[in-house]
Design a protein with these regions (language model features):
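FAD-binding core of FAD-dependent oxidoreductases
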Residues: 1-32
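C-terminal substrate-recognition/cap domain of FAD-linked oxidoreductases
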Residues: 27, 31, 37, 42-45, ...
Length: 172
């Protein structure tokens, strides 16, 4: 899951236990990251942000996290005024500095019309600042808010899917 491991998702929500019993498993562990960088970029056009994500993806950078959040979601969650789309990009490594990867990702964002929301260089708290930090706080709070909203018939969530780039704009 994009939200990380959680025993309740493995047992309660999956077929495990209902269709059989797990008798064996394995896990691959990585060292805890010592090098981290997060930045945020604002875009006036959602599809420009999507093009920046595509550029980062096709540059072979493999960020630990890259998300675009549209203006409506930012506004609903108190992370923006609805006038911009936010792209959050993060890199992590237990082995080596990530500056070169973050620099290239920033070039991709700026090349596609993004402007810096939160600078990353020499800023270990970038993930807590600006629209990036406000959205992060809302994202972490969302499961608790969902408990209050769902009984009232309000459902607001992120749905992940996969589609080819040439069909993305029409799909969105």
């Amino acid at each position: 899951s994009g939200a990380g491991p959680s025993p309740d998702r493995f047992v309660a929500l999956g077929s495990e236990g209902a269709l059989g019993i797990i008798t064996e498993g394995w896990a691959r562990l990585q060292g805890r990251p010592t090098y981290k960088a997060t930045a945020g970029y604002r875009f006036t056009d959602f599809f420009d942000a999507a093009r920046a994500v595509r550029a980062v993806s096709q540059a072979g950078l493999y960020p630990a996290n890259v998300r675009i959040v549209d203006g409506t979601e930012l506004q609903v969650n108190g992370a923006g005024d609805g006038s911009f789309t936010l792209m959050v990009v993060s890199f992590e490594s237990a082995d080596h500095p990530v500056d070169a990867w973050m620099e290239r990702a920033e070039e991709c964002c700026l090349d596609h019309g993004g402007t810096v929301d939160v600078p990353w260089r020499d800023n270990p708290d970038a993930h807590l600042q600006g629209a990036v930090g406000a959205w992060r706080t809302a994202f972490i709070r969302m499961p608790y808010n969902r408990e209050q909203l769902t009984p009232r018939g309000i459902i607001s969530d992120t749905f992940e899917t996969a589609i080819t780039w040439d069909r993305f704009e029409e799909f969105y």
